[in-house]
From Swiss-Prot:
GO terms for biological process: ATP synthesis coupled electron transport. InterPro entries: NADH_UbQ_OxRdtase_chain4L/K, NUOK/Mnh_C1-like. Belongs to the complex I subunit 4L family. It is found in: Mitochondrion inner membrane. This is NADH-ubiquinone oxidoreductase chain 4L. GO terms for molecular function: NADH dehydrogenase (ubiquinone) activity. Its main location: mitochondrion. It comes from Eulemur coronatus (Crowned lemur). It is a multi-pass membrane protein. Its EC number is 7.1.1.2. Core subunit of respiratory chain NADH dehydrogenase (Complex I) which is composed of 45 different subunits.
Length: 98
């Protein structure tokens, strides 16, 4: 496995670990999720270019579209939670909490 792919996989794992460790704030979770999507985009683009998958050239673009939609929904949720509660804790999103 080339060193570029290894570094990108390590970046994905680091973002995943950051998502698991720093899950109390919504902003840090969104940043880690964006890092995961960016590393997935770069890895899929490199894989398609290196293996000459001519039929799969649209996959990285679709991944970017879903990442943009995820970022927009996440930021809208962050603004709503911040305006409602004054904090960006994920525990404020629990609907079962009284």
């Amino acid at each position: 496995m080339p060193s570029i792919s290894t570094n990108i996989i390590l970046a994905f794992i680091t973002a995943l670990l950051g998502m698991l460790i720093f899950r109390s704030h919504l902003m840090s979770s969104l940043l880690c999720l964006e890092g995961m999507m960016l590393s997935m985009f770069i890895l899929s683009t490199l894989t398609i270019l290196n293996l000459y998958f001519t039929t799969s050239f649209m996959m990285p673009i679709l991944l970017l579209v879903f990442a943009a939609c995820e970022a927009a929904v996440g930021l809208a949720l962050l603004v709503t939670v911040s305006n409602t509660y004054g904090l960006d804790y994920i525990q404020n999103l629990n609907l079962l909490q009284c």
